[in-house]
From Swiss-Prot:
Participates actively in the response to hyperosmotic and heat shock by preventing the aggregation of stress-denatured proteins, in association with DnaK and GrpE. It is the nucleotide exchange factor for DnaK and may function as a thermosensor. Unfolded proteins bind initially to DnaJ; upon interaction with the DnaJ-bound protein, DnaK hydrolyzes its bound ATP, resulting in the formation of a stable complex. GrpE releases ADP from DnaK; ATP binding to DnaK triggers the release of the substrate protein, thus completing the reaction cycle. Its main location: cytoplasm. Pfam families: GrpE (PF01025). This is Protein GrpE. Keywords: Chaperone, Cytoplasm, Stress response. InterPro entries: GrpE, GrpE_coiled_coil, GrpE_head. Belongs to the GrpE family. It is found in: Cytoplasm. One of its GO terms (biological process) is protein folding. Transmembrane segments: none annotated. Homodimer.
């Protein structure tokens, strides 16, 4: 009986390492599976957070680019406004030079004063043109976008509504009217 018990014990002793080994392998397998699941969860969590951060980055970058463009546009508009304001301030000076030239030319077209005023006016108009400021043409056709009719006169030479005389030169800045030309137009009854 003792032998039987010893044999059974030996038999169990031999099975015990196999059982432990099998139990350890099962436990390791379960731990690996749990670790894999945790790793998968961590990876999913990381990918989700990465995606969120990337989307935030893209939004912030787009906002930054929009602000940058808006600032450039505002800067450009401020510069345009400054040029326009300077041009408006120069118009009375140009008018005075034109008046002086007209008076000097009536007295003596060949005088040094007349020639000097002509050269000054030419240079001034060149500078203004370089910066987008130019005189409004006053041909025969009256255009309310560019001309301001301040009086009507009888004219045998001009048709009704045509420009007879330019009383004050008009100017535009990059196509936009700074000051309309003051003109008289024909009115024939």
């Amino acid at each position: 009986m003792k032998d039987e018990h010893n044999q059974e014990h030996d038999h169990l002793s031999q099975k015990e390492p196999e059982f432990c080994e099998k139990a350890c392998k099962e436990q390791q397998y379960e731990e690996k599976q749990e670790a894999g699941e945790k790793e998968g969860e961590i990876k999913e969590d990381f990918e989700l957070k990465y995606k969120e951060m990337h989307e935030k980055y893209l939004r912030v970058h787009a906002d930054f680019e929009n602000v940058k463009k808006r600032l450039e546009r505002d800067k450009s508009m401020a510069l345009e406004y400054a040029y326009e304001k300077i041009a408006l301030d120069l118009l009375p000076v140009i008018d005075a030079l034109l008046g002086a030239h007209k008076s000097a030319a009536e007295e003596d077209k060949e005088s040094a004063l007349t020639k000097g005023l002509e050269l000054t006016m030419e240079k001034l108009h060149e500078v203004l043109a370089r910066h987008g400021i130019e005189g409004i043409e006053c041909l025969e056709e009256f255009d309310p976008h560019f001309h301001n009719a301040i009086m009507q006169v009888k004219s045998e030479e001009k048709e009704n509504g045509k420009i007879v005389q330019v009383l004050q030169q008009g100017y535009k800045y990059k196509g936009r009217v700074l000051r309309p030309a003051m003109v008289s137009i024909a009115k024939n009854d």
